[in-house]
From Swiss-Prot:
<comment type="function">
    <text>Catalyzes the transfer of the enolpyruvyl moiety of phosphoenolpyruvate (PEP) to the 5-hydroxyl of shikimate-3-phosphate (S3P) to produce enolpyruvyl shikimate-3-phosphate and inorganic phosphate.</text>
</comment>
<protein>
    <recommendedName>
        <fullName>3-phosphoshikimate 1-carboxyvinyltransferase</fullName>
        <ecNumber>2.5.1.19</ecNumber>
    </recommendedName>
</protein>
<feature type="binding site">
    <location>
        <position position="346"/>
    </location>
    <ligand>
        <name>3-phosphoshikimate</name>
    </ligand>
</feature>
<dbReference type="InterPro" id="IPR023193">
    <property type="entry name" value="EPSP_synthase_CS"/>
</dbReference>
<keyword id="KW-0808">Transferase</keyword>
<feature type="binding site">
    <location>
        <position position="96"/>
    </location>
    <ligand>
        <name>phosphoenolpyruvate</name>
    </ligand>
</feature>
<keyword id="KW-0057">Aromatic amino acid biosynthesis</keyword>
<feature type="binding site">
    <location>
        <position position="319"/>
    </location>
    <ligand>
        <name>3-phosphoshikimate</name>
    </ligand>
</feature>
<dbReference type="GO" id="GO:0009423">
    <property type="term" value="P:chorismate biosynthetic process"/>
</dbReference>
<feature type="binding site">
    <location>
        <position position="171"/>
    </location>
    <ligand>
        <name>3-phosphoshikimate</name>
    </ligand>
</feature>
<feature type="binding site">
    <location>
        <position position="20"/>
    </location>
    <ligand>
        <name>3-phosphoshikimate</name>
    </ligand>
</feature>
<dbReference type="InterPro" id="IPR013792">
    <property type="entry name" value="RNA3'P_cycl/enolpyr_Trfase_a/b"/>
</dbReference>
<feature type="binding site">
    <location>
        <position position="171"/>
    </location>
    <ligand>
        <name>phosphoenolpyruvate</name>
    </ligand>
</feature>
<feature type="binding site">
    <location>
        <position position="195"/>
    </location>
    <ligand>
        <name>3-phosphoshikimate</name>
    </ligand>
</feature>
<comment type="similarity">
    <text>Belongs to the EPSP synthase family.</text>
</comment>
<feature type="active site" description="Proton acceptor">
    <location>
        <position position="319"/>
    </location>
</feature>
<feature type="binding site">
    <location>
        <position position="15"/>
    </location>
    <ligand>
        <name>phosphoenolpyruvate</name>
    </ligand>
</feature>
Length: 435
């Protein structure tokens, strides 16, 4: 088994922040400069739909550490109504973030548009997108089973709204905020459980703590958004895979540089630390309201099994749960997850996908509606080459690509190219750490 040591200096730029920087740039007044923008398929899909609506977008490719490519992006806009009617469907490809958040901007435009995507995205629920926009006065049509395509007849007279999120969702919070920027009055988005707060930080929105423990994001209507520069830090969700590799591999020690350490994104690190993982955060600083730092991880053979059930922790670490499950199973032979039904509505049904593939490599699992448990290993461990189904989901593919480095059999992952959605240089970085 290989040992993994060294530094990762070119983590993929954070997808969540990059999406928002581009979308905010499209409604800002002036020129928005974004440094370290991602070349991954999802973020490029956001730039693509902006260009299809007439927004001027320019990209400059730069060669960074290890020869990997980063990008600077410049977006020119003239305020809320800079967009023009697209000539055809706006293709979001596999990016649910693009589809959901851009819908908030399209709802305020004086034209009709339609958001579509690949076969996976077209199966994902969009009722949570349509509902608040309809309440604000936009005409939104979905398929008969409330999935994409999302057809929007916008209006320049959106009504302000007080909207309580039915489930924690930073994407729905952001789409309502982007729509409410155009509305004729002040709006509020109310959260019972906190979700990613990048949109609030980037727009400088006020957040009020309510007496019952909830919080309210305040969005002023029709207040000009001045253009400003954004720098995209490293994606903590991508860092999770490197961290898992370091924790699982004997003798390994890895430093991941310039990671976004926003507390709404690092719940998974708290889960790992609570289980005895050797992880430390160093060189902490702040940029654009975001906490950034370096993460040091060492092989942790004494880790305890992970158990995740707190709804707030689930919401905070929803994207990292597949990797956490695979990590815990490989390290300890056990894992527990509850209150995570939302995982069934991601790029794949991630509960079933993880269970299926863990069973293929010799683990015993119990699956239920809102989670699953790994209860041990089968009496007979598979040998030779084992087929792993990525379910066309980048996080499933990467989770089992990490497992492939530490399990006794060879894993053959279907459609591994889907990893390019969020981490184009995944395999190159992994191999650069191998000693």
């Amino acid at each position: 088994m290989k040992v993994y040591k060294g530094e990762v200096n070119a983590l993929p730029p954070d997808k969540s922040i990059a999406h928002r920087a581009a979308l905010i740039g499209a409604v800002a007044d002036g020129t928005t400069e974004i440094s370290n923008f991602s070349g991954g398929f999802d973020n490029q899909s956001t730039l693509g739909v902006l260009q299809a609506c007439g927004i001027a977008v320019h990209q400059e490719k730069l060669k960074g550490p290890n020869g990997l490519i980063s990008r600077n992006v410049v977006i020119h806009a003239q305020g809320f109504w800079s967009l023009s009617r697209p000539e055809k469907d706006l293709m979001c490809n596999n990016s649910g973030s693009t589809m959901r958040m851009f819908a908030g901007i399209l709802a305020a435009q004086p034209f009709e548009s339609r958001l579509a995507g690949d076969s996976s995205l077209m199966k994902r629920p969009m009722q949570r997108v349509a509902h608040p926009l309809r309440l604000m006065g936009a005409d939104v049509a979905l398929s008969s089973d409330n999935t994409a395509p999302v057809a929007i007849r916008g209006t320049t007279h959106l009504r302000p709204i007080d909207y309580e999120l039915p489930v924690p969702s930073a994407q729905v919070k952001s789409l309502v905020a982007l729509a409410a920027l155009h509305a004729e009055g002040e709006s509020r988005v109310i959260e019972t459980l906190p979700s990613r707060n990048h949109t609030e930080l980037m727009l400088g929105l006020k957040v009020e703590a309510l007496s019952d423990g909830r919080s309210a994001v305040i969005i002023p209507g029709r207040k000009t958004v001045p253009a400003k520069p954004f720098h995209i830090p490293g994606d903590p969700s991508a860092a999770c895979f490197i961290i898992a590799l370091g924790l699982l591999s004997a003798g390994s020690e890895i430093v991941v540089r310039d990671v976004c350490l926003n507390p709404t994104r690092t719940g998974y690190m708290g889960v790992l630390l609570g289980a005895g993982a050797e992880i430390s955060m160093e060189n902490i600083r702040f940029a654009g309201g975001e906490k950034i730092g370096d993460v040091l991880v060492r092989h942790s053979p004494s880790m305890k099994p992970l158990s995740i059930s707190d709804p707030a922790v689930v919401a905070n670490s929803i994207d990292e749960i597949p990797m956490l499950a695979v990590l815990s199973a490989c390290a300890t032979g056990a894992f527990e997850l509850y209150n995570a039904a939302e995982l069934r509505a991601k790029e794949s049904d991630r509960i079933s996908a993880v269970v299926d593939n863990l069973e293929r490599i010799g683990f015993v699992c119990d699956e239920y509606a809102d989670g699953f448990a790994v209860t041990g290993r089968k009496d007979v461990t598979p040998t030779g080459k084992v087929a792993i189904d990525s379910y066309d989901d980048h996080r499933i593919a990467m989770s089992f690509a990490i497992a492939d480095r530490v399990v006794p059999m060879e894993l053959d992952i279907s459609d591994a190219k889907v990893i390019g959605v969020s981490f184009p240089d995944f395999f190159e970085i992994i191999e650069s750490l191998a000693t």
